[in-house]
C-alpha cells in the first residue's frame, strides 16, 4: 500500500531541508511529473533536479519555509506559509508568502505548482 499524500509531501519537505538528503527528492516524483513555477515549467524524470537547479544560486543564496497550515483533500495537498533566507545580494528576507499545491498518486508526486511572492517583494527579478 502506498503512503498517504501528506506523508509523501512531508517527506519531500524533510529532504529539502536536509543538504545531504536534498538530492534524493527525485525518488518521490513520478517519471512523468510536472512542476510549475511562475515563468517556467519542468517535466519528466529530470523535473526535480531541474527545479533544484532553478531555485539554487545565483537566484538566491538560500531559502527555507515556515509552515502555516496544510490542506489535504484526496490526492491533493496544499502547503501555505512563508519563506525566509538570504537573497543573491546577501540581504536577508523573511515573511515572503508561498502556496505549494501537490497532486500525489500511488505514493508519488505527479504535479507540483509553486506560487510565491519573491518577485513582488523584490527578492528576485
List each language-model region with its residue ranges.
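A solvent-exposed, acidic/Ser-Thr-rich amphipathic alpha-helical stretch
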Residues: 3, 22-75
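Short, cysteine-centered beta-strand-loop-beta hairpins and adjacent loop/turn segments enriched
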Residues: 60, 85-93, 125
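Short, surface-exposed coil-to-beta transition loops
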Residues: 63-65, 93-99
